[in-house]
Structures are given as C-alpha cells and as structure tokens.
Amino acid sequence: MAADGLSSKALKVKRELGENTPLLSDEELMGLSVRELNHHLRGLSKEEVARLKQRRRTLKNRGYAASCRVKRVCQKEELQKQKMELEWEVDKLARENAAMRLELDTLRGKYEALQGFARTVAAHGPPAKVATASVITIVKSGANQAAYS
C-alpha cells in the first residue's frame, strides 16, 4: 500500500505542475527546441501535450507558408523584370534586323544593277568611249576633322 500512496502522490504532484505551469506564448512555443519543449511538457496531460504540439506544428506551418508566399512574390517580380529585359532585347534585335534587311535590299539592288551592266557589256562589247570621272580626295587636317565630328 505504500507504493500505491507514493504513486498517487506523484500523480498529484504532476497534476499540480501541469496546473501551475505557465502557458507558453506562440513565439516561445515556436522558438523552443524539441528538447526544451519536451522539458516544458513534462507533467502535462496527454491531451494538453497533444494540443500544444499541434499548436506548435500549426504555427510553424503558418510561418513556412508565409515565407513561401514571400519567396514566390520575389520570384514573380524577378521573372517579370527578366521578361521586360528580354522584350526590350527582342525589340532591339528586331530593329537591327530591319536595318540589316534594308541594307541587304540596297546591296542586292546594286548587285543586280552591276550584273545587268556586265551582261550589257558582254553582249555588246565595251562602250566605244568611256567617260572618265575625276576623283578628288579631300584630306582633313586634325583641326578640320574635329570641326566635322
């Protein structure tokens, strides 16, 4: 019977500890390590332990979800920035492409004109008298070159 008296006394002490243990705030509950949490949960009923552990799990999941949302927003902003940069690059390349096509068309026209001239010369022979053109070369001095730049 002494053992029964001792065990009932131990249960009474545990209940008293559970009743006297201050409740943990949400911040404290999340900040505790598992070892510290288990130390705080000693003497509490199984239901109370389960309730506090579930509360801790819920709070931690809420924190993880919030950080995930922040990360997703940051990634979205970064992707939008990259998209704008790529759209700008595509526009720039389209303008360069259009300019090169224009230059290509101009060169193609000159090439076709030269081919036509070559065919004419080949079919009729060289012209009897070719008009020569004078070529004037203008050399710019350093001072004049700065004025033209």
From Swiss-Prot:
Q: Which GO terms describe its cellular component?
A: nucleus
PROSITE patterns attached here? BZIP
| Tissue expression profile of the protein | Highly expressed in the ovary, lower expression in the brain, heart and mesenterium.
Biological process annotations from GO: regulation of epidermal cell differentiation; regulation of transcription by RNA polymerase II
Among InterPro entries, the record links this protein to: bZIP, bZIP_Maf, bZIP_sf, TF_DNA-bd_sf, Transcription_factor_Maf_fam
Give me the ranges of the annotated region Basic motif: 51-76
Q: What does this protein do?
A: Since it lacks a putative transactivation domain, it may behave as a transcriptional repressor when it dimerizes among itself. May also serve as a transcriptional activator by dimerizing with other (usually larger) basic-zipper proteins and recruiting them to specific DNA-binding sites. May be involved in the cellular stress response.
The name of this protein is: Transcription factor MafF
